[in-house]
Amino acid sequence: MNQTNEQRPFDYIAEAHLTASPHFYGDCVPLAHFGEVLQQAIDALNALDRIKKALFYGRDLGITNVSGEVFQNCNSLPEWISKHPDEDDKARNIIHAIIGKATEAGELLEALQATAIEGKPFDVANAGEEVGDGFWYDALLARACGLTFDGIQRTNIAKLRHRFPNAFTEYDANNRDLFGERRILEEGKKVSS
């Protein structure tokens, strides 16, 4: 029995693949420049990881003062997200999730660097671990924002289908309808399951 689109279960990975670029323009980027920028990103995200570990795990950051500036700490960060004290846990989880997701991306960049620059085999087991850790941070953020993975995935695919009605095209990637995409995000418009 052939299933129609309405009967098929929603498969985010398959749906995402439909809107992925099939092209790779490696000749447009010098390898040395790629390696340099990759290292800068890794260094910045490692510094952010040290901040995350200080903020959420109590580790010593090793910074006692900031020269030339009045020292102000990060205690007020949750208040900048929400002015309601009863929502401080949510605000802290939002901060933790965003910083944590970025630091997991840094670990994936290290895996890419090891392969692309150092010539080591790509470590699939490590990549899976980092994706899983990224999911953990995504779950923390989703819960704090009252969202679900299913809802996020369906809305994301609806946005991408708006951008690429049939499949990925370079024209559509470079000429986006940002207002239409934002409307989909705000409405939580979902693809049919």
Model-derived features: where do they sit?
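Flexible "arm" and connector segments at domain edges
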Residues: 1-131, 135-193
